[in-house]
Amino acid sequence: MNVFGTDGIRGEVDLRPCGTRQAIDALVDERRLTLPLAWLAGQALARTLDAEDAGVVIGWDDRPGNPALVHAVQDAFLAAGWNVTLLGTCATPLVHHVLLETKANAGVMITASHNPVEDSGLKVFDASGRKSTPEFEVRLTRTMLDLAQEDHDLLHLVGDRADGDHGEDRFEDAHADWLHARMEDLSGMFPD
């Protein structure tokens, strides 16, 4: 079993409370993305990578359910002792850029790209900024299934906020500077 599709985990956002076992079933059987499922994904990523002094970069787009999903993913990483950098509402390339700039261990972009607005999803990136491999996603799924068998008190996830330092201003400027520098590198390829 693999809860990941071709580009991460995606489903219709469902903010109603449910247990972790029900969260897995809701995604697999009904394509519903719940807060406990987002938490399981964050915990699974933290446990699978198991890095010392680990850090994760989290960005999201402006879909209605995303602040609550961000809170769930953030909570999972904080519970695992990870440093969390919240980028705020941003484009996926900013997650890649900040991931590489900060030398974080992982990145998560909360979006469903071209899917309907009521959907969202989790795209996972490794320390090199690459999309997770199918083999790694199977490992994450197994860890999520194991975690779902444990009892977790996740009622505190109900809500729609993302706490913490949102570094979007600091990182958007750095990303813009990086893009300008790249364009200057390519300027010789184009005639005036």
Give short role names for the model-derived ranges.
Residues 1-73, 79-80, 168-192:
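An N-terminal, well-structured beta->alpha segment
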Residues 7-9, 95, 140:
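Bulky hydrophobic/aromatic "packing anchor" residues in well-ordered structure
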Residues 12, 120-192:
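Gly/Ser/Thr-enriched, mixed-charge loops and adjacent short helices
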Residues 46, 50-132:
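Ferredoxin-reductase
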